[in-house]
Amino acid sequence: EMQMTVVPLSHDAANTVGYVIEAGGEKLVYITDTGYIRNDVKERIVNADYYIFESNHDIEMLMQTNRPVYIKQRIINDSGHLNNEDSARVLSEVIGERTREIVQAHISQEGNTRAQAYGVLEAELSRRGLLRSDLKLFPAEQFGIHLIAGKNNAS
């Protein structure tokens, strides 16, 4: 049996939502396209096994792009996209001992790098004493495919 819960997000498109999917005793959280995470949403996404979570931009890198100012402002506001630091902070507040993998998603091609997103998350988890050898961190490729192998499919 599978259960899917929709969680409200903050984006400049109507009715933007994330998902909490539970099946086979495991929980996956999928959140992209949001400028911030409300506290009631944080409560719903605590201690998932897997997170696919937006880490859209590095603020300094974004500001150095050739994008128009209004686009940059749209991206960094509360109904835009999560920057690396905010994403890492939220993740450090919600992951738990059952968390096995974090996939960083929606990484901007112009305003971020996979290495930058990964480094910020790794540093934040380390600073809070949350980095573990059994916790996988994976910054997703823009057009790649990443397989999350659940506990029943682990090789």
Regions from the language model: what does each represent?
Residues 135-155:
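Short, basic/aromatic-enriched C-terminal tail that caps enzymatic domains
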Residues 1-50, 148-155:
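Core dinuclear metal-dependent hydrolase active-site scaffold
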Residues 39-138:
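Cap/insert and terminal regions of metallo-dependent hydrolase folds
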